[in-house]
Amino acid sequence: MNSPAEPRCIVSLTYDDALPCHFESVAPLLEEHGLHGTFYVPCSQGFFDNAESWREVATQGHELGNHSVFHPCHDQAWLDEAYNLRHYTARRWSDEIRLANNILTLVDGRTVRSFGNTCHHNIIGSGATASTVAKLVPEFCVAARGEHTGKPVDLKKINWFNLGTRGADQATFANLRAEIDRMCVRGGWLILTMHGVGPRDHNLHIAENEHTQLVEWLAARQDTIWTAPVRMVAEALKPSRRALAQAAR
């Protein structure tokens, strides 16, 4: 489904951490049903090991979103302390995001993409030196998925650099369908965050059958629900981006 003139009901399917299931089964499933997603890929060893597979994902129309290089987060038990956002400066974070953008451009040839906040965190540093992703990311990306809010984006007051997302790991199709149906009554943009699809690649995951049902349902409703990558939605809805796109036609 192409961008409608005034989209009212939007869904973005986003997948984190460059997992093998994403290019092996998720992207092909979306393509089979005429849909595209955003894959937020950290530009670390796992990504480099499968660079050609990710290039093919991008070639098929999916977004490769910036998800940093080292996946820094705040105070996670599994986190290498060297990559604790508490210890980052604004410059260090900016340098890492710039590097990730450059790497992704080498893979997909694109210079415009969205950012997926690692662990949904928005704070860089701590105390008096703290900054926010929302303040820094406009230099690098057209939009940022932002913090976990558990609700749709209000189309009347969009914060482009802290959009807000709903985690869909462990979610059921029935619950997601009900949420989307409610959103479509009043209008909105639901950005769903998933890690694994099935349990193979990540302890955070949505069951494969629940995910397949969601994809099939969205594909059957492309006349009323616009399912699109975050970058594509931003380019369609942001006035400055829309003007550039129209001028290029």
Language-model-detected regions and their locations in the chain:
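C-terminal domain-boundary segment and adjacent tail
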Residues: N2-A5, G37, G46-F48, C141-K156, ...
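Short glycine/proline-rich turn/loop motifs
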Residues: P4-R8, W78-Y83, G198
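Short, well-structured secondary-structure segments
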Residues: I10-T14, H22-H74, R113-N117, R145, ...
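Short, surface-exposed alpha-helical recognition segments that flank or form part
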Residues: T14, Y88-R92, H202, I206
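His/Cys-centered metal/cofactor-coordination and adjacent catalytic loops
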Residues: D17
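Amphipathic, non-transmembrane alpha-helical secondary structure
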Residues: F23-E32, A51, R55, T59, ...
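Catalytic domains of cell-wall/extracellular-matrix polysaccharide-remodeling enzymes
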Residues: S25, L30, Q45-D49, C73-R177
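Short, solvent-exposed loop/turn segments at secondary-structure boundaries
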Residues: P42, S126-A128, H202-I206
